[in-house]
Structures are given as structure tokens and as C-alpha cells.
């Protein structure tokens, strides 16, 4: 099985009040195509930091990579410029974030937030993106999905917001889906 993701000796640290601390210490693992891998550990063990490192979504420069390589399809993501990472994020690699209440924009409708991802990465017109958004919301179990298109996040339950986040992550049929406690609110 070919390696889709290969992480080698990843160490991640944070700086706070001039003091450095290590959150992830030389973690290595790989994920093959079609494979499911779970990172298991107690709270604070670095699971989320490891996941966020893959897409360089940590709060840089407070966060820093002390060592390691992150290869996605044999390309070292750690050395890629931001514009390249933007083309990967939400398209080839998607992430279901742990906290849907703060991950959705409170000012935009569910339709806008999901369809925008589809339009941006797939180049579809709004009507086609809207139809795909409706299909995705139905697929993840949103009741009365058509009515929910115009809803703002605060009008949905926590579980429904989590389902919207799952729909967003699946929207572009990513090669790799990272799920950081995806069922927290379900």
C-alpha cells in the first residue's frame, strides 16, 4: 500500500512568556491510501497538535516545529509556501475540527459556508454548488436540509453544527480526512 501521509520524527513546541515547551516529541506514523488510523492518547498528549501540524494550522510563530518531516503524496508539506498549502487545505486534505460551535462563521448561512468551499475548489457555479450542498447536508443526516440552507449556525443544535462541519470536510472528496474528535457534539 502506498503511503498517502508519512510523518517522520515530528516535534512541535510552543513559546509562552519566553519559555519553550515541547507538546509533541518525535512522533512518527504513516497512513496508506484507504487506511484508517487512530491516534489514541490522554488529554494533552499532542493528538490535536499533531493533526493541526499536518496542515500548518497552529498559531505560528508561538508554535514552532523543532524537527520532523510531513510528507503528503511524497511532498514535504513543511517546506511548502502558503499558497500551495491553501490549495491542499479543504481540498486534498480536509479536517473535521473538534469544536463546531467556534468553527462555523456565525454571520454566514450554512449554505454560504458549505457552497463556498465547493465553488472555490471545484469551480462550480452557485446553483450546482447549492445542489451539492443540499446533497451533502442530507447525506450527513441534517433533517429538513433544504430549510436549513438559510439557517445561521446559532439556529442549529450542536449536533447539527457538527454534521455541517462533516459535510464541509467531505465536500471536495479529499484524499485524506483528519477527524479531531468529530463526534464531540453529536
Give the location of each predicted region.
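Catalytic Walker B motif of ABC-type/P-loop ATPase nucleotide-binding domains
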Residues: 177-180
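Conserved ABC ATPase "signature" region
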Residues: 76, 128-147
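A short, proline-enriched helix->beta-strand linker immediately N-terminal to the Walker B motif
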Residues: 171-175
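Conserved ABC ATPase signature
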Residues: 151-156, 160
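Hydrophobic anchor residue at the start of the ABC signature
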Residues: 114, 166, 186
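Conserved ABC transporter NBD signature motif
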Residues: 65-76
Amino acid at each position: 500500500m502506498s503511503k498517502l501521509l508519512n510523518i517522520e520524527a515530528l516535534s512541535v513546541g510552543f513559546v509562552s512568556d519566553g519559555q519553550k515547551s515541547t507538546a509533541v516529541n518525535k512522533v512518527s506514523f504513516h497512513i496508506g491510501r484507504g487506511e484508517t488510523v487512530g491516534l489514541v492518547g490522554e488529554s494533552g498528549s499532542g493528538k490535536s497538535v499533531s493533526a493541526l501540524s499536518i496542515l500548518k494550522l497552529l498559531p505560528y510563530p508561538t508554535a514552532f516545529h523543532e524537527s520532523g518531516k510531513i510528507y503528503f503524496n511524497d511532498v514535504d508539506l513543511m517546506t511548502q509556501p502558503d499558497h500551495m498549502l491553501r490549495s491542499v487545505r479543504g481540498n486534498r486534505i480536509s479536517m473535521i475540527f473538534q469544536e463546531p460551535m467556534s468553527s462555523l462563521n456565525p454571520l454566514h448561512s450554512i449554505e454560504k459556508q458549505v457552497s463556498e468551499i465547493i465553488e472555490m475548489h471545484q469551480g462550480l457555479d452557485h446553483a450546482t454548488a447549492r445542489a451539492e450542498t443540499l446533497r451533502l447536508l442530507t447525506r450527513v443526516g441534517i433533517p429538513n436540509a433544504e430549510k436549513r440552507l438559510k439557517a445561521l449556525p446559532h439556529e442549529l443544535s450542536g449536533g447539527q453544527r457538527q454534521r455541517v462541519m462533516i459535510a464541509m470536510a467531505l465536500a471536495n472528496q479529499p484524499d485524506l480526512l483528519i477527524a479531531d474528535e468529530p463526534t464531540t457534539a453529536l
